[in-house]
Amino acid sequence: MASWPPLELQSSNQSQLFPQNATACDNAPEAWDLLHRVLPTFIISICSFGLLGNLFVLLVFLLPRRRLNVAEIYLANLAASDLVFVLGLPFWAENIWNQFNWPFGALLCRGINGVIKANLFISIFLVVAISQDRYCLLVHPMASRRRQRRRQARVTCVLIWVVGGLLSIPTFLLRSIQAVPDLNITACILLLPHEAWHFARIVELNILAFLLPLAAIVFFNYHILASLRGREEVSRTRCGGRKDSKTTALILTLVVAFLVCWAPYHFFAFLEFLFQVQAIRGCFWEDFIDLGLQLANFLAFTNSSLNPVIYVFVGRLFRTKVWELYKQCTPKSLAPISSSHRKEIFQLFWRN
């Protein structure tokens, strides 16, 4: 096949790596040319927004002199995971600009792909953990103790990072630099030692990294929404009820955005597996899967830069924390500005 997505979808067959020259099915050369021109710029844009946005989120969470609550612990870890992920994207942008001739050596070939694979697991496991915490808080509030939940959140995040790292070890070990004489390049490819690895990889990718977490996410959030609808009055009377509702709205938005960004990737990954085992055949499916994988990969990438935008526009409490951080960092010698004076300043600023 022709797919060349960075998220470890390559076959060990070299003839499946490059769309223009390496396959008998060449029905969409214009689409591939367009993708190769557009994708590097798109990747760099995602990297820039993701780097600045997630750094900003981490600063807002970590700079204030106070302890993080449970939701903030999970969201800070999610931002850290996204930040580590986007740091690897410029290498893939350069790889595409360089016609897939990997210029960074074998160690970075393994390391960058290992980081990308680890992020895939860490991100979705964190989303599951966030949903589970909201479920316990809203559906079983009497069983949730703040101090205990905070300790559990820290331990859970450490375990998620460790498990994500362990699950990325096969990628680190099986990625390699290999010459492709027909194209006169040296490519960073995934070398699967046996055909059985294709099945093991799709089980890991589609079931462990998506379907099982998706089932847990749907279960938790279904009961969260039912609890919010059925116990609205109770939530208002509980201490912190309004705050919990705002935090839950933010988390539900993050969950939906995550699923929208990542579901197409797993759909096309499963189609690729069906093509590899010849359950589906033909040039139409090959081109459809190859192009779909490329687009789905980079739709998934956007999630890492989309989360900070969600924090700002959906997270009302997050915006409050930004304002508190601003006041904390502003010199106390500066006199506070009255609302009327502030309005005059804004009018002068926006006046042409």
Swiss-Prot record:
GO terms for biological process: calcium-mediated signaling; cell chemotaxis; immune response; inflammatory response; positive regulation of cytosolic calcium ion concentration; response to mechanical stimulus. Belongs to the G-protein coupled receptor 1 family. Bradykinin receptor subfamily. BDKRB1 sub-subfamily. The chain crosses the membrane at residues 42-62, 73-93, 111-131, 154-174, 207-227, 251-271, 295-315. Residues 63-72, 132-153, 228-250, 316-352 are cytoplasmic. This is B1 bradykinin receptor. GO terms for molecular function: bradykinin receptor activity; C-C chemokine binding; C-C chemokine receptor activity. The gene is BDKRB1. Keywords: Cell membrane, Disulfide bond, G-protein coupled receptor, Glycoprotein, Lipoprotein, Membrane, Palmitate, Receptor, Transducer, Transmembrane, Transmembrane helix. It holds the Pfam family 7tm_1. It comes from Chlorocebus aethiops. It is found in: Cell membrane. Its main location: membrane. This is a receptor for bradykinin. Could be a factor in chronic pain and inflammation. The keyword Iron does not apply.
